Amino acid sequence: MKQALRVAFGFLILWASVLHAEVRIVIDSGVDSGRPIGVVPFQWAGPGAAPEDIGGIVAADLRNSGKFNPLDRARLPQQPGSAQEVQPAAWSALGIDAVVVGQVTPNPDGSYNVAYQLVDTGGAPGTVLAQNSYKVNKQWLRYAGHTASDEVFEKLTGIKGAFRTRIAYVVQTNGGQFPYELRVSDYDGYNQFVVHRSPQPLMSPAWSPDGSKLAYVTFESGRSALVIQTLANGAVRQVASFPRHNGAPAFSPDGSKLAFALSKTGSLNLYVMDLASGQIRQVTDGRSNNTEPTWFPDSQNLAFTSDQAGRPQVYKVNINGGAPQRITWEGSQNQDADVSSDGKFMVMVSSNGGQQHIAKQDLATGGVQVLSSTFLDETPSLAPNGTMVIYSSSQGMGSVLNLVSTDGRFKARLPATDGQVKFPAWSPYL
């Protein structure tokens, strides 16, 4: 774990230009429906003020998941510095059955020890459900906080935490030599940096399953092209630059293939490239437009958008052959799906009655639940644990990023201050 904390994102920081973060999570609704939990400010054992509010990071992570409602600090019945100091009755009286406490200690070599304990207030005093400690340098303190959040979240829900993940997105600003930027940040908007700047539009970033590369669309050559960029060194590999449209890249879960849409023969159709050999094969054909592929977990089947029935709907096709099967039936049109990592559901843009929102469809039953309530919602991307969706929506004359939990109860915004933000893509586990 300590080794992971030191190197997990080192390859990114080596070359990337780090920016002052422009994106922060702003809670809109739903936090009150989460499970109450206590997160105490971590005890600082050094001089002056603590270099980072680790307890605040943990509380924010748990709140952002939509599954927890951390008690406001002003209402904490006590501020224990260790598990032994937790008084169960004081917390149980507030309906809280779990409390996170922690300590941050400076080391002579300039590093820090970060420790936490998850305390069960329903058991004997000092009963610890989970605990860990990490030795990190100052720049990794936030990462240590996210690590603690992941472990607490998994212990209490049985679901792997996704707080150490990242998001990629495109920012468009007005004026300047490079008005389009592909950026990456922590899932909560911190530690933002630029992957690529361009005078021409950038679109549709997609993560490789190991998190080391991004595929995206660029127009820098005068027409659309698909490229894959390695984050560690910035190396760019051009994948496709055929006449007309090249777009909608999607890595297969096993990392061996890239699906995308081309219109080199007229209509948009799906193609799959074997990344080792570079060989491309066509998956769909016909006069309809077929685009926006997303993989099922088996790396053999795709969900995609097609207008073969008139309006856009989501279909499923095996890349080895066979006729596509329509899988969306509710609403006037459905498109731009993202299938969950377990293959049990997908999120998509669903339009009905003049409204365009993010919806979730159970792939076994076909049941659909509308998740969002913002305006002109598009490009949904699932967190790797399937608990949250990031998407873009229109606000005023521009576009912003939004979060919604996949149960629809929790909603938040990630407002940007320096431009329109589009095409969000949630990373795999890192």
From Swiss-Prot:
One Gene Ontology CC term in the entry: membrane
InterPro entries in the cross-refs: 6-blade_b-propeller_TolB-like, PD40, Tol-Pal_TolB, TolB_N
Entry's localization field: Periplasm
GO biological process: bacteriocin transport; cell division; cell septum assembly; cellular response to bacteriocin; protein import; protein transport; regulation of membrane invagination
Positions of transmembrane segments: none
GO molecular function terms attached to this record: protein domain specific binding; protein-containing complex binding
Chain positions covered by the region annotation TolA box: 22-34
Pfam family for this entry, one: PD40
Consequences of knocking out this gene: Mutants lacking the tol-pal cluster suffer delayed outer membrane invagination and contain large outer membrane blebs at constriction sites and cell poles. Tol-pal mutants fail to complete division and form cell chains, and fail to process denuded peptidoglycans at the septum.
Keywords: Cell cycle, Cell division, Periplasm, Signal
UniProt signal peptide: 1-21
Quaternary data: The Tol-Pal system is composed of five core proteins: the inner membrane proteins TolA, TolQ and TolR, the periplasmic protein TolB and the outer membrane protein Pal. They form a network linking the inner and outer membranes and the peptidoglycan layer. TolB forms homodimers. Interacts with the peptidoglycan-associated lipoprotein Pal and with the C-terminal region of TolA. Interacts with the trimeric porins OmpF, OmpC, PhoE and LamB. Can form a complex with Pal, Lpp and OmpA. Interacts with colicin E9.
Functional summary from the UniProt entry: Part of the Tol-Pal system, which plays a role in outer membrane invagination during cell division and is important for maintaining outer membrane integrity. TolB occupies a key intermediary position in the Tol-Pal system because it communicates directly with both membrane-embedded components, Pal in the outer membrane and TolA in the inner membrane. The Tol-Pal system is also required for polar localization of chemoreceptors clusters. The system also appears to be required for the activity of several outer membrane-localized enzymes with cell wall remodeling activity.
Record-stated family: Belongs to the TolB family.
Domain comment quoted from the record: Effector proteins that bind to TolB can both negatively (Pal) and positively (colicin E9) regulate association of the distal N-terminal TolA box with TolA by influencing the conformational equilibrium experienced by these residues.
Name the record gives this protein: Tol-Pal system protein TolB
Organism ancestry: Bacteria, Pseudomonadati, Pseudomonadota, Gammaproteobacteria, Enterobacterales
